[in-house]
Amino acid sequence: MQEYCELVRRLYAEIASGDLGYIPDSLGCVLKTLDGIAANDALPSSVREQAAFAAANLLVSDYVNE
C-alpha cells in the first residue's frame, strides 16, 4: 500500500472502513475514470496519453484473460 500516494491510501482506508461507498465493478470504474481523463481537453496531452495508454492496456488484459 505504501507505493501509492497519500490520497489513494486515505480513500482506501475510508472505503475499507465503510465511510465511503465501495464500487463492486472496480474495473469498470477505473476504465470510466481513465477514459474521462483521456477525453479531457483541459488536461495536458501527456496526462491524457498516460490515461489512454493505461485504459487500453486494461482493455487488452481483460480481453486476453477471458
Curated annotation (Swiss-Prot):
Q: Tell me the protein's name.
A: UPF0253 protein PC1_0961
One Pfam match, given by its short name, reads UPF0253
**Cited HAMAP family:** UPF0253 (MF_01064)
Membership in a protein family: Belongs to the UPF0253 family.
Superkingdom:
Bacteria
